């Protein structure tokens, strides 16, 4: 019996990042990229329609950023897990992201294998971390 396939929505305002992540994740047999959004607003619309298991969310985007989009997403779809993928590695941003409801926080210069491990960990966790 094969394990369930993780359905992922990629959210980033940079097309090359979205497409690169989709291509990279598409090579994994246990991951299906169900959609790509370029803003927090579009992420909320697509998540409501596509019901992803995990949203891979950029932190800083024009319009609604990743923090606010995460807050709204976990309110409207608490079964969906959010992992921040960002170029910002500071502790304050990470705490803010976790307080908004994100389950994981990974910087964009993370090794590909570590990104996959973090994504799988976020998908399999049943609890939300607390950040104080």
Identify the residue ranges that each predicted region occupies:
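Active-site beta3 strand of CheY-like receiver
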Residues: 50-56
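Short amphipathic alpha-helix used as the core "switch/output" element in two-component signaling
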Residues: 45, 67-79
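Conserved acidic segment of CheY-like receiver
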Residues: 4-17, 21-25
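Acidic catalytic/metal-coordinating carboxylates
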Residues: 39-42, 62-68
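Short, flexible helix-to-coil linker/hinge segments that flank and couple to helix-turn-helix
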Residues: 92-99, 104-132
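Active-site T/S-Asp motif of two-component receiver
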Residues: 57-58, 69
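Active-site residues of response regulator receiver
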Residues: 12, 58, 86
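Short hydrophobic/Thr-rich beta-strand motif most characteristic of the beta2 strand and flanking loop
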Residues: 30-38, 46
